[in-house]
Structure formats: structure tokens, C-alpha cells
Design a protein with these regions (language model features):
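Phosphate-group recognition and catalysis centered on beta-loop-alpha active-site segments
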Residues: 50-186
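Bacterial Sec-dependent N-terminal signal peptides
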Residues: 1-2, 7, 11-53
């Protein structure tokens, strides 16, 4: 086994290179085989860990009883089942406040998230009895759940200036709750 090199899958080639060279007669073939086996087991375990899928709840776990899309309850329920992360949708209101809701116009109403005020939007009662949450209320809840990642979708707005303002306000809010390092913005 002198000069034996363990072949590493390409996905790990930048991280690991294992070579065994028999430099003296003090290392037996049995010892070399054990080292090779240990390295192979380590790499197999690393590959298994790296390949684990991560579950992200879309708009929270809103199909659970007493929940609704993008509600505070949907985030809490998603966190309770151990998801890796939870995705939310964020809009900038007409009075430049950030709210969490999926659709531009709330179903069954004429309330447009971008063209309505915070007061108008937060007066909407969701199917679970909550009101449409502000981003601030949502981030306060996320900050209290340190094991859950946030995937934040900034919704497209009517013009680039409003999108820039929304982005600035989102980053400021994430900083306020120290959540920048565990938030992905899409």
C-alpha cells in the first residue's frame, strides 16, 4: 500500500486531501488499512451531513390549525416542528411602513399592500384571528427563536426608488434585531 492515495469526491476536493505513504517499516499494513478505513468513514459521514436537506416553510406553517399565511402563528408553528427556516413576504405601504403579506391585494378586498396605509392594512383580520403583522412584530418573534433562519422576500414595488427605500428599511430593521447574519433576502 505504499504511496496509496484516497480518492476524494470532487465536491470535497477543495477541503480534503488524504494521502498515506509508508515511510518506514514501523507502520504495518494492518495499521495502514485502519487509517484508510478511518479516513473513508470520516469522509462518508461528512458527505452524509453535507447532503442533509434543509426544510424551509413557505409563508410559515400556515396549513396548521389556527394559522394563516405569513401570520405570527405560522412562524411559531413552523419553528415548533424544527424547520431550518421560514420564508416571509414583505411590502412597503403607502405611508412607508413594512408589512408581512404574500399577495399585492388581500383576497376578497380592494386593499393593495403598496397603495394602502399601515392602519388600513393592519385592520385586516386573517383567518386565524390575527391582523396582518408588521415586519417589526415579525422580527421581534424571529429574534426570540435563534435556531430558525429567516428567508425574506422583498416584494417588487411600483418603482425603483420605493424598492430602494424598502431595502434600506428592511436592512435597518434586521440590524435592530441583530438578524442580518441569519436572514437571506430574495
Amino acid at each position: 500500500l505504499q504511496g496509496f492515495q484516497l480518492v476524494i469526491p470532487e465536491m470535497f476536493s477543495n477541503f480534503v486531501k488524504v494521502s498515506f505513504y509508508k515511510h518506514s517499516t514501523n507502520i504495518s499494513n494492518d495499521m495502514t488499512k485502519k487509517l484508510i478505513l478511518a479516513a473513508a468513514m470520516l469522509l462518508t459521514g461528512s458527505a452524509a451531513v453535507a447532503a442533509q436537506p434543509k426544510v424551509i416553510s413557505h409563508r410559515g406553517y400556515w396549513t396548521a390549525p389556527n394559522s394563516a399565511q405569513n401570520s405570527l402563528a405560522s412562524f411559531t408553528k413552523a419553528d415548533s416542528v424544527g424547520v431550518f427556516g421560514s420564508e416571509i413576504d414583505v411590502w412597503l405601504t403607502a405611508d412607508d411602513k413594512l408589512i408581512v403579506n404574500h399577495d399585492r391585494v388581500y383576497k376578497g378586498t380592494d386593499i393593495n399592500m403598496e397603495k394602502s396605509t399601515l392602519k388600513e392594512i393592519t385592520s385586516i383580520v386573517l383567518p386565524n384571528g390575527e391582523n396582518i403583522p408588521t415586519l417589526d412584530a415579525y422580527l421581534r418573534l424571529v429574534a426570540a427563536k435563534p435556531d430558525t433562519r429567516l428567508i425574506l422576500e422583498m416584494k417588487s414595488l411600483s418603482d425603483l426608488k420605493r424598492e430602494d427605500l424598502a431595502a434600506e428599511k428592511i436592512v435597518k430593521a434586521l440590524r435592530k434585531y441583530n438578524l442580518l447574519d441569519r436572514t437571506d433576502i430574495i
